[in-house]
A protein has these predicted regions:
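Noncatalytic, solvent-exposed loop/strand surfaces
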Residues: 1-178
Length: 178
């Protein structure tokens, strides 16, 4: 963690990651972007799962193992956790058992886990989209864009896209998803 006013380090955490899978340069095992609610920082690493750290001192608050993703290509994991209210969402689309998961930010308990059996390896981070008075959790992957109920994980809608492997996240502006 870095002090935004001075640029000086506040604290640093290192993790024992175990054996890291091979990835193609210039990719990194730290490709995911952390999320923070101002009290906690949530980080994802493919060999650790999601770890919650205290923003003040870096102390580990909880850890949720997600299982190592299985990728046929050596690009490595890149999706990032997303916060909405007191829920943390993460999509692990891999070549064996893709799923979308919701965790309680306070303790890391699983609220729901929705399989995505028609998805192969993907690298997109979910986004929240509010349109027509409803907020959906939207995830791109394997030639589809899908919307889910963020409270239950139920798939609400799907839209076909042109690409099989999607590496970018959807962008939301007003009531439109790009």
């Amino acid at each position: 963690s870095t002090n935004p006013a001075t640029g000086k380090p506040l604290w640093k955490r290192e993790f024992e990651t175990g054996t890291l899978p091979r990835i193609t340069p210039p990719n990194s095992h730290a490709s995911s972007t952390p999320a923070s609610d101002g009290k906690r920082v949530f980080v994802y690493f493919s060999t650790l799962g999601i770890v919650a750290l205290d923003v003040a001192d870096g102390k580990e608050l909880w850890r949720r193992s997600l299982g190592k993703p299985a990728y046929l290509m050596d690009w490595g994991a890149a999706a990032s956790p997303v916060l909405h209210g007191d829920s943390l969402y993460f999509c692990q689309d891999d070549d064996l058992a893709s799923y979308l998961i919701s965790l309680d930010t306070a303790n890391g308990e699983v609220r729901w886990r929705t399989p995505r059996p028609d998805m192969l390896a993907g690298y997109a981070t979910p986004v929240m989209c509010t349109a027509g008075g409803r907020t959906d959790l939207v995830v791109a992957g394997s030639g589809k864009l899908k919307g889910y109920d963020p409270k239950t994980g139920k798939e609400l809608w799907t839209c076909n896209t042109l690409l099989r492997t999607i590496m970018t996240s959807p962008v939301v502006k007003d009531d439109i998803i790009y």
